[in-house]
Amino acid sequence: MSRAGKSFAPPILGLGLLLAACHPTGAQYVSDLDVVATTHDATFDFAVPSTYSRPDRIPLITGDPTTSPPEQLDPQLTSLILNTLDNEMSAIGYTKVNVSAGPDLVITAGALKVTNVTYYYGYWCTYWAYYYPCYPYYPPVVGVSTYTVGTLLIDMAPFSTTTPPNNQIRGVWTAVIRGIQTGSASTDQTRIVNGISQAFIQSPYLGRP
């Protein structure tokens, strides 16, 4: 499994190139193509928040933000992904609460259904307007293309019930996990858990003291 971690300074546009890169020695197994890339806002203090919330669904991102309602990832994979996220967040000191309780952070996840789709934070409102105030993210942002089918995108942002400056929300952490769908249920489940765990391993700045 390949790993990459970057901090936000100027907007980062290179994750797509990383994910599209060829395996240096030639892939023998599907798992050889796995990539986990993470980025974060280096100015954000992740030790301050104590609570988070997340939706209970994971949309399939098709490249058409007008699709309503969006298709959803199948329940079994959704449950595995969200439970793994909860376990990782709990292990580093964050407590999950209902969104109505006013969490410090909100985490959303999406899975790509198509290849060669361009992903921008600004389109996230399309998928989460029912759950989270619909404001586009502002730089630092990630704009990438050529993710592969089955890539899992995980975003973290501060939660607010008030209108943010310039009507824009600052994203503070993103994980991009390629290779969560191969057609083999048992293999996919292992790769999902390993990929999410690796995203947290390579993000040591996350967590409370």
Regions found by a protein language model. Give the residues of each.
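Extracytoplasmic/periplasmic, Sec-exported soluble proteins
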Residues: 44-46, 69-81, 99, 142-148, ...
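Surface-exposed short loop/turn segments
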Residues: 109-164
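C-terminal/domain-edge helix-coil "capping" segments
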Residues: 23-43, 145-155, 160-172, 177-209
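Compositionally biased P/S/T/G-rich terminal and signal peptide-adjacent segments
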Residues: 32-65
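C-terminal motif of bacterial Sec signal peptides marking the signal peptidase cleavage site
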Residues: 18-21
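Bacterial N-terminal signal peptides that target proteins for export
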Residues: 1-12
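N-terminal segment of the mature soluble domain
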Residues: 54-114
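Extracytoplasmic
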Residues: 49, 89, 102-106, 147-151, ...
